[in-house]
Amino acid sequence: MVREDIRNIAIIAHVDHGKTTLVDQMLKQGGVYHENQQTVDRVMDSGAIERERGITILAKNTAVHYGKTKINIVDTPGHADFGGEVERVLKMVDGVLLLVDSFEGPMPQTRFVLKKALELMLKVLIVINKIDRPDARCEEVVGEILDLLIDLEADESTIENPILYVSARKGTATLDLDTPGTDLRPLFDAILKYIPAPEGDPDGPAQVLISTIDYSEYVGRIGVGRITRGVFKAGMNVVHTNVQTGVTSQPWRLGNLYQYDGLKRVDAEEVRMGDIVALSGAADLSIGDTVCAPECIEGLPFVKISEPTVTMTFQVNDSPFAGREGTYVTSRHLRARLMRELQTDVSLRVSDTDSTDAFEVCGRGELHLSILIENMRRQGYEFAVSKPRVIYREIDGVKCEPIERLVVDTPQASAGAVIEKIGRRRGTLEHMSGQDRVRLEFLVPSRGLFGYRSEFMTDTRGEGIMSAVFERYEPVKGDIPHRSVGALVAHESGVSTPYALFYAQERGTLFIGAQQNVYEGMIVGQNSRPDDLVVNVCKQKHVTNMRNASASEDAMRLISVHPMTLEECLEFIDDDELLEITPKNLRMRKRILNAGDRARQWRYKQD
């Protein structure tokens, strides 16, 4: 049986192509907000980091009513590092809106998520956004999307579906570029016409596949999924089972049932086939579990989540400043927090190491792990992490490494430098197009991209756009240069002085300013030469009774201090270095703090 009063859709798009803004407008025009109600932009990006960076990390659910139809909307992450979120969420919907920027066109992440949607046989509706951009190239972008659909072997009905042209900022949609839209009605109508209604047995034994897990201080774990069969009622007895593990729970009583209405989660006494529901009552409910009636225990297969490609070591901070700034500093705290993350992030892997104070954490990419680090830091955790490393695999007896598809959009003048740098990092140019702005497509090892983003922004004078997505594993490509410059390393512990920094800046770029606490072995800057250099940044100017206006500390000006962001620190550190993370500071340091001990270690390795 088909439920015509409901549609379940996901919006898939590349980072910053405007999907959260489009959802805002759909909510406004669907009557979720009262007239004259004050609203914030990008309501779906509810996390602090999401608002700051303008990216969606966790998939969100909302619902809007159009006529007599309820449209459940899932806003998904656009970055492949959060692909674990995307893959799970697609199991809850019957169709997707493919949202593409009218200038940038389809990007690697668009391809990644679209491929997953087509594998699940979901209906696709193409939406070109930002048609009011002065540099919009709608017709060319439509051609690129159709090429992509053909390349991914989409069926004819998808390719022949009408294309919608939207300005999410203005809240307008049209089927014809020559006829400007006035509201989003054409989009809503297309959703009802081309996205199929949920289908299933409304009278069979109740069954729902849990796709995401939420947590509430009041009711504990909340499982979210789409009901594939039957009816759930608050207080009824159910069990949960898992196809992969084969484990089935004892019967338990359903606690609260919730449905989505606008931006709110509202209590429901009864939910039926086709509804997206949130339910509580089991403390051990996990992603991939099927909640069903005890008289018909039947697990549903769960989507295969892509394996991690990048690993880092998270360890207890053992620097001289350990414990000063963090609330949670012990290995017990660190372990508990990582295990808690595993409950909601299916793409993450955490394992023990030889040391009780260190854990191996594997994720889908640098961004995936850096968001986890930033979240932990804001929650009061203090710890240290190693340089990101790729995860190698042995395939048919051959050591293989992850290869990424890199798409670069850059001014013509910078294209040569980009091609040369990627070539040095073992990348191969696959495709090149464009005149004033050049679009380059490479296949490059994941480790070749570590540390490249800041170099890329320098080469393109901040005008370049780069985006990469995991493609496949291939035999190891050989050595790749990591860092062409050395580090300026603090000689002693103390407080940095303007006098010492004034002379240290001649050696390279400083990362710290005056009056900052430093310790021996801490990295305070970037050397202009390839080797590390030990510098004294705590040196005081000797007081004499001679006047020397030119050497006055007042006349000493620091040329430039470059405070490092989390991503820049992760790109910069080498194998023999760590990044110390506290709620207040990021400090890069040598693993071996004493310069003499480092020299002895180096000589030992040479022998």
Sequence positions of predicted segments:
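A short, contiguous, amphipathic alpha-helix enriched in charged residues
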Residues: 319-342, 555-561
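Long insertion/accessory domains within large nucleic-acid-processing enzymes
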Residues: 260, 265-268, 400, 444, ...
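Charge-rich, low-aromatic oligomerization/scaffolding segments with amphipathic character
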Residues: 137, 289-292, 360, 366-382, ...
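Conserved nucleotide-binding/hydrolysis micro-motifs of P-loop NTPases
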Residues: 17, 29, 79-80, 103-106, ...
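Interdomain boundary/hinge elements
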Residues: 38-41, 152-166, 198-209, 238, ...
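P-loop NTPase switch module centered on the Walker A-proximal segment
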Residues: 1-100, 104, 144, 213-216
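Canonical P-loop GTPase G-domain recognition
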Residues: 123, 133-193
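Conserved nucleotide-binding/hydrolysis modules and their immediate coupling elements
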Residues: 207-312, 322-324, 485, 494-544, ...
